[in-house]
């Protein structure tokens, strides 16, 4: 889902 992708992107950026 789009929301899941968005949350995953935020998580990856936070690394």
Curated annotation (Swiss-Prot):
**Entry keyword set:** Glycoprotein, Lectin
Entry comment on modification after translation: Glycosylated; contains about 9% carbohydrate. Heterogeneity in carbohydrate composition may result in different isolectin forms.
Record text on subunit structure and interactions? Dimer of two identical or nearly identical subunits of about 32000 apparent MW.
On the tree of life, the source organism's domain of life is Eukaryota
This protein is called Basic lectin B2
Q: Which Gene Ontology MF annotations are present?
A: carbohydrate binding
